[in-house]
Amino acid sequence: MVDKRESYTKEDLLASGRGELFGAKGPQLPAPNMLMMDRVVKMTETGGNFDKGYVEAELDINPDLWFFGCHFIGDPVMPGCLGLDAMWQLVGFYLGWLGGEGKGRALGVGEVKFTGQVLPTAKKVTYRIHFKRIVNRRLIMGLADGEVLVDGRLIYTASDLKVGLFQDTSAF
């Protein structure tokens, strides 16, 4: 049985990456450096834009984060794909929070828009995930819209983020 708390610390997220938070069969978050959040501040089964579930998480920004040193030299900016991956990570985390089992895999996204950037001078990135649908059959899948904010300003949106949980990924 999953302990369905409303918030999770960095240590909780690291435990998820080790397969300890949602059990041996539950989905795992990636380990650092690909773990793109420091904490989950809110998780609910209702709420969000569609009243079908909501997740909000945060990443503290500092100039020493690994991607600023290589993307780009002399023009550091967080790669937009990392913000997109963070949203997929949170959809999979939510499926585990609901009790889903399997290995999480991103299955797609409808549309992504980038209207801003994360620079090393920023303080905090906030991710907001609004669930539209959860499929809980042979395939467990989450469908959601997401937003990325930097210091309170909306900079990315994504529609129809899809993540599935698979018992066997050998044929995937």
From Swiss-Prot:
Q: Which residues form the active site?
A: 71
- Principal localization? cytoplasm
Q: Which GO terms describe its molecular function?
A: (3R)-hydroxyacyl-[acyl-carrier-protein] dehydratase activity; protein homodimerization activity; trans-2-decenoyl-acyl-carrier-protein isomerase activity
Quote the record's activity regulation: Irreversibly inactivated by 3-decynoyl-N-acetylcysteamine (DNAC) which binds to the active site and forms an adduct.
Q: What are the subcellular locations of this protein?
A: Cytoplasm
Q: Which Pfam families match?
A: FabA
Gene3D superfamilies tied to this protein: Hotdog Thioesterase
Top-rank lineage group of the source organism? Bacteria
Provide the Gene Ontology terms for cellular component.
Answer: cytosol
* Pathway(s) where this gene product acts: Lipid metabolism; fatty acid biosynthesis
**NAD as a keyword?**
no
Q: Does the keyword Iron-sulfur apply?
A: no
Induction data:
Mainly activated by FadR, but minor repression is also conferred by FabR.
| Homology family | Belongs to the thioester dehydratase family. FabA subfamily.
Its quaternary structure? Homodimer.
What function is annotated for this protein? Necessary for the introduction of cis unsaturation into fatty acids. Catalyzes the dehydration of (3R)-3-hydroxydecanoyl-ACP to (2E)-decenoyl-ACP and then its isomerization to (3Z)-decenoyl-ACP. Can catalyze the dehydratase reaction for beta-hydroxyacyl-ACPs with saturated chain lengths up to 16:0, being most active on intermediate chain length. Is inactive in the dehydration of long chain unsaturated beta-hydroxyacyl-ACP.
Q: What is this protein called?
A: 3-hydroxydecanoyl-[acyl-carrier-protein] dehydratase
